[in-house]
Amino acid sequence: MLHFPLVRIAAPLCHPSPEECSEDYAWFRARLADPNLLDGAVGVKVNGAVLLAVPAGGSRRGGYLSVGTVADAVRVWAALRGRSGFPRFRLSLSAHRGTCHTVNWGPRQPREDAERGRHFGYAPSAIDTFLFLHRGFRKGAGRCSSPETDP
């Protein structure tokens, strides 16, 4: 347990049930090469919602959570920092105040789609499906995407 002010600002953690985060669990279960990683998932409560943080392990080298404000990003960072399964923890703040702030763990994610899918531990079939559906669309697209929700 941290013994300095971060403890007071940290977002609450929970062990969400598959029912509580059913859409997230279903999404990850359909894509992860090792769905057993969901057993170590942690829920982070942000503005009344529970965000599912899936740890690194096996072929999954890293992950992230996306939040809407800098304050939420700092609270999530403070909550997950130092937890097992969340190595090399860091914040990535967007140039735009209210969008696309992420809390990342593991090595920096690759830029290339297939490599990024492997970085997040997705099954080859999930990566192939993503590449088929998004071929040519992602190059230079000016949208705020969530790499973990793409493949």
Language-model region placement:
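A conserved ligand/cofactor-binding region detector
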Residues: 1-109, 115, 124-151
